[in-house]
């Protein structure tokens, strides 16, 4: 696969939340597409293992994305090693649920808010100018179809995701106003994500409607092949598996 950028130097792409199956798949696909990939996680052993799975040339980095100063140091490290970041694929999240509204716990809310909102705010504030200045700047987050019809049992989850989506749409407005208008902020929407490991551990389940992490990865690569003005502010639904 050819590089999404036709220029001599490859795109510098940061995959945040890179330790899981989706992070591995996205980093691998971007690496194969010719990007210079930095995959970020909070646990050194896990992110190094993920980078190894993603392939030669993928660089693992450790950062607590909930801490703004740590994210600023992350930018300094990447910039020193490879120059400005062109794109961030934000895969940090998490899920918590309850039975209804009364038992939505503060602990679950704090967990979801930190994972879905705080990390995204920090990463976007620190890397916004770099992405906006790139000729192929992209920012993408993954959201959920649960926002279409919010259910009481997942009130905290959908509220956190909605906040993250709103912030991303505000980024899109910022990119429109930036000089050049070459950057795009996008929300990728799935019902759920599934990978081969999850299927092997749960052979009795069919995961109807879930999107394979390889399809997510392919969708991320496609973001660099479409014009920014067509993508910016888009909420793109990814296909899931049909019921079996």
Language-model-detected regions and their locations in the chain:
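Conserved glycine-rich cofactor-binding loop
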Residues: 19-20
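C-terminal helical subdomain
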Residues: 182-189, 195-196, 203-244
């Amino acid at each position: 696969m050819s590089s999404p950028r036709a220029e001599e130097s490859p795109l510098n792409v940061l995959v945040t939340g890179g330790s899981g199956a989706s992070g591995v798949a996205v980093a691998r696909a971007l690496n194969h597409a010719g990007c210079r990939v930095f995959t970020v996680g909070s646990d050194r052993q896990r992110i190094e293992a993920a980078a190894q799975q993603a392939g030669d040339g993928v660089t693992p980095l450790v950062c607590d994305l909930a801490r703004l100063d740590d994210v600023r140091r992350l930018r300094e490290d990447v910039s020193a090693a490879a120059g400005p970041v062109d794109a961030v694929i934000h895969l940090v999240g998490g899920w918590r649920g309850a039975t209804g509204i009364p038992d939505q716990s503060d602990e679950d809310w704090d967990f979801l808010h930190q994972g879905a909102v705080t990390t995204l705010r920090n990463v976007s504030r620190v890397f916004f100018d770099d992405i906006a200045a790139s000729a192929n700047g992209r920012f993408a987050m993954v959201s959920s179809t649960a926002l279409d019809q919010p259910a009481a049992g997942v009130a905290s989850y959908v509220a956190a995701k909605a906040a993250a989506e709103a912030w991303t749409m505000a980024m899109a407005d910022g990119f429109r106003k930036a000089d050049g208008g070459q950057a795009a902020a996008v929300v990728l929407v799935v019902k759920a994500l599934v990978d081969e490991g999850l299927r092997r551990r749960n052979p009795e389940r069919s995961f109807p409607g879930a999107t394979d992490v390889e399809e997510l990865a392919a969708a991320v690569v496609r973001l660099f092949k479409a014009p920014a003005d067509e993508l910016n502010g888009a909420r793109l639904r990814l296909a899931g598996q049909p019921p079996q």
